[in-house]
Amino acid sequence: MCRDNDIILGLDLAHMVGNVEIDLNSHDVDFATWCSYKYLNSGPGGVSGIYVNSKHIKDDIIRFEGWWGNKLSSRFEMLKKYDAEHSAEGWVLSNPPVILLDMHLASLEVFINAGLNNVFNKSKLLSDFLYEGLSSINNYNKFFDIITPEESTSRGSQISLFFKKSSEEFFSQISKKFVVDYRKPNVVRVAPVPLYNSFYEVYLFVSEIDRIIKSYD
């Protein structure tokens, strides 16, 4: 549809990269951007990333131009014409933060050593195990609904629970043993991480949710 109507398609992949497998080239996406602090584990304030389709890697495109987007081979020649890198680097404007890049590189090396297929496969198995465990709790739907799609191809690792009552109390209790995220007014977000969470930890989490629900009976 975008191609037929001469529309440039850009995607915000904020919490997708490192969490969901995607092939931007096969979908002919024009450009995309994402953060790295969460599912790529580079930490708060971590650098972002960009993707630019190779069909846009050309010299005559109108864009913001900066020192670090110029080819390194001619950067210090002080040419009057912008000599862009023929990659996404041609869109870089200024000096990236070196320390943050170092932290990001260390994280990416962990992903590479683990193998991306292994990471995504374990993530799917972990989140499926979590989903099945939560939905098997007796009378869970009296307290919360699972608002994340059940089909693993329609989601990443995060499972969101929409609480019908006592959401802050639930969050307070579960946070004594597990790291989860609370979003007002009544959503608790849970995301088992394949690089360091185990199936046993997911089992313990589901058991704790079950215990808390039973304590309200």
Identify the residue ranges that each predicted region occupies:
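Pyridoxal 5′-phosphate
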Residues: M1-D217
